[in-house]
Amino acid sequence: MGIDSSLPNLLDLVGLKVATISKIEPVASELPWLFSDLMKFVNQSKYQRVDNKGKVVLVETMRVGLNFFGIENLIIVLTSLAFKRSLPQITEPYPMIKLRIWEDALAVAISCKQIASLVGVNQNHAFCLGMIQAMGKVVVSKLYFRLFETVLREALVETQDSQKHEEHAALTRITPSGPFLNHLIDKYALGVSARLIDKMAMKRVFIANAMFEVANNKPAADISPLALVLKQGKAYAQYRILKRYKLIDVEQSKAFIRTLGMPAGALELLKATDIRSLDLRMIND
């Protein structure tokens, strides 16, 4: 339903200053999906390297894949791959839900990382929190579609067995409600994310308290620096997404930006940042 149970230990290990690929590889291998997903990621055309004969050099081992971007970037890579793997697959009649959740999570994570770089907050923790804060949306969405399917199936069987033909026909036309799902996400998602992160019980990736502060909607003046980064990253990502889909006009944009209380230089940095795709070349710059 949520994050892979082996991920917290792996992220904690990667967070150690003395971490090495030889120590990380056995733990990484406990995630059965990681090898194939990591190979697809590092062998993307934008990351491909060529030898002196111009032939593309493919990455084919877990060890090389884990070390491809450096240990310092592994938390970002692993968190992104794990989150993407968790996205809901069956969301008919709303096939774009999976894309929208990923789009939001990535935009928030990248925005948080960039803001963190300006205020002395750990950038890896900021990215990790910015992405995993969206796990509540994943869990709520999966539960909603699963429960809808279960209840509808039971109702169809009941009306068929009792020969209630009109009711049965009406039930076949019922589909999940997008507005109701949005209501459930607005009401429960952040709290679910906070409890999920707390259950992960990570000892070196310190993001649980900040998530609870944001989920409990504490005032900006009373929260930790990481929680403030998350609030600002979420707000800025929301602004950029609304602007992309032309759901906010220029004057609304200016007014909204003024409410964010962003640190000096943040808006300029974020304006120049691509928050739509994870590009490790940006991270390595």
What are these regions (language model features)?
Residues 113-117, 163-168, 243-246, 265-269:
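Low-complexity, flexible helical/coil segments
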Residues 1-131, 137-155, 174-254, 275-285:
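Conserved alpha-helical "signature site"
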Residues 156-172:
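A structural motif
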Residues 159, 237-240, 260, 264:
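Short, flexible helical or helix-coil boundary motifs
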Residues 252-254, 263-271:
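Hydrophobic alpha-helical transmembrane segments of membrane transport and translocation systems
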Residues 167-171, 242, 257, 270, ...:
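Extended hydrophobic/Leu-rich segments
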